[in-house]
Amino acid sequence: MTKFFAKTAAAALIATAFAAPAMAQNASGTIQLKGNVALSCTIAVQDLGQSLSLKNGESNKTVGSVTETCNSGSGYKITLASANAGKLKSGNFTIDYQVNYDSFTGALTSQAVVDRANAQFNKRSDLKVTVPASDQYIAGDYADTVTV
């Protein structure tokens, strides 16, 4: 019986010796993970169809809203431009006005730029208009177009 145990122990020891190198080996490899997010900047402009009370004037009347979405990590720019250089026109007659859009307030005599320092998602800003009251405006239908 002792011989049997000795042979069994020897066989087990040999099997372990051959298995040990396989368990001791340490193999590794690498897997690279890659992906890309495309730049996507969009705006949705909603014209509220408001009529301005020119004779009585308007103070920060909301005339539209803009929803901005841009995933640029370095930010982006929003531009505001007036077709009539910041004036409501009726033929040759004009009425000055000012706009307020987020951090910009002023006349759109030239293109205005609002800088965004980082990405924004569904950022909503209202476009507001201020028109001074006057009894001396000339009769007519006045209009301008603001492009965002």
PLM region descriptions:
Residues 1-2, 33, 97, 144:
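Aromatic-residue detector
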